[in-house]
Amino acid sequence: DVCTVDRALYEHDSFDGFRVVHVPGHSPTDTLYLHESGGFTVTGDHIIQGVNPNPIVRRPLPGQERQPSLIQYQQSLLRTRYLPLGKCYPGHGQPFSNHIEVVDHILERQEKRNEKVLNALGQEAQTPWMVAQRMYGNMSAGDFIFCVSVAIGHLELLEHRGVLRCWRDHHGVLWYQRKNAGIRHAFIIPETETTRESVQ
């Protein structure tokens, strides 16, 4: 069936006692519906007890840049941690009331995954695809987007924190390397490649 949109909702809007809180990351449109007087929140897939929701890399809309989904997600999680959510009704699983503990658990698991990404990266310059292969081996078609999204998300996060440097080669491919490592690639690439540092 085709549904008609009666009303577009935006950050800080309210309806029927609910407050709209935009929490992008897991998906660009993730939203909390916070009912403070009722003491509960519809959290959807933003936080789920016992699950580490993975932000999937998505193609940007025409004229827009792709957003760093994992960085967005962590920012949204830190915001969510301090909201008075009360009882949470997620998109999957059972309701829960310990949202601070759930948020902290997700953030802890992401830090552990950062270490796995760094271990897979080693001291060489690698692409996100190469890191995903080192982490997951042969990926099925169904797991491909998940595995590559994990690699891209954590590489972007580590670059954002100043741990990695990143540059784009003349084919448009992104490469990442630890900042404390000399320039070494996992395999030979053309000497005409330019790095972000050399352009600046």
Which residue stretches match the model-derived regions?
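Acidic/polar short surface loop at catalytic or gating sites that assists cofactor/ion binding
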Residues: 1-3
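Short acidic-hydrophobic, aromatic-tinged amphipathic segments that line or gate anion-handling sites
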Residues: 6-10
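Generic structural signal for short, solvent-exposed loop/turn connectors between secondary structure elements
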Residues: 13-20, 37-39, 122-126
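Short polar/acidic secondary-structure junctions
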Residues: 14, 23-25, 169
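Metallo-beta-lactamase
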Residues: 19-114
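C-terminal regulatory/interaction regions
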Residues: 115-200
